[in-house]
């Protein structure tokens, strides 16, 4: 991590983009799964 930190400034924006993509997919997925599970329990 220390190696190529200031030598590779292109690696920084990619990490941010990846973080946004992962969270953009993971948060709604977890919310959807939670909502479905809640409905299953509320149904009965």
Swiss-Prot record:
The lineage of its organism: Eukaryota, Rhodophyta, Florideophyceae, Rhodymeniophycidae, Gracilariales. Heterodimer of an alpha subunit and a beta subunit. PSII is composed of 1 copy each of membrane proteins PsbA, PsbB, PsbC, PsbD, PsbE, PsbF, PsbH, PsbI, PsbJ, PsbK, PsbL, PsbM, PsbT, PsbX, PsbY, PsbZ, Psb30/Ycf12, at least 3 peripheral proteins of the oxygen-evolving complex and a large number of cofactors. It forms dimeric complexes. Its main location: plastid. InterPro entries: PSII_cyt_b559_bsu (IPR006241), PSII_cyt_b559_CS (IPR006216), PSII_cyt_b559_N (IPR013081). It is found in: Plastid, Chloroplast thylakoid membrane. It is a single-pass membrane protein. HAMAP family: PSII_PsbF. The gene is psbF. The keyword Lipid metabolism does not apply. GO terms for molecular function: electron transfer activity; heme binding; iron ion binding. Heme binds at residue 23. This b-type cytochrome is tightly associated with the reaction center of photosystem II (PSII). PSII is a light-driven water:plastoquinone oxidoreductase that uses light energy to abstract electrons from H(2)O, generating O(2) and a proton gradient subsequently used for ATP formation. It consists of a core antenna complex that captures photons, and an electron transfer chain that converts photonic excitation into a charge separation. Belongs to the PsbE/PsbF family. Signal peptide: none annotated. Its cofactor is heme b. This is Cytochrome b559 subunit beta. One of its GO terms (cellular component) is photosystem II reaction center. One of its GO terms (biological process) is photosynthetic electron transport chain. With its partner (PsbE) binds heme. PSII binds additional chlorophylls, carotenoids and specific lipids. The chain crosses the membrane at residues 19-35. Keywords: Chloroplast, Electron transport, Heme, Iron, Membrane, Metal-binding, Photosynthesis, Photosystem II, Plastid, Thylakoid, Transmembrane, Transmembrane helix, Transport.
